[in-house]
Amino acid sequence: MSRTLEEYHAEIEPMMAEGDALAATRDPATVDLVKRRITDSVLVIAAYQMFVHREVFAPMLDGADATTRARVNELKIECIALTEDLRFNVRDFVGRMETAPLDWDLVAPKVAWFNGRVREHIAHVRAALAPDLSDADHARLRAYRTAMVGVQAA
């Protein structure tokens, strides 16, 4: 069954909110859950990347002017970089977990940094898909989404 962009975003946003919460609490009892969620995020972000390149970016490039092509290519590059950064950090994380306990001081800032980049990417994709919306319209949409899935996911 084919998924939509909103369905991907609706899956990714709560995952990030949960990651933020886990990193904030730093509960040693959640280490196994953190490992699972990090692995889950690799799969979801990789699937999202394939989807968004095929179903969103490719159609946006079809017949686009030079300005639009440049903007979409920036989005594509950032999407690829997100996936690669996640894979690299997960490999590093898994390697460390085999020899040492979870280092929250190392993991928490990486989670915040990565989730911030994903949120920014999602906002840029949404803005590219709805360029006629004003800043106020986008702010209202973010406020609505915040009410729906939590402040960290907006």
Report the location of each language-model feature:
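Small-residue-biased structural context
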Residues: 1-154
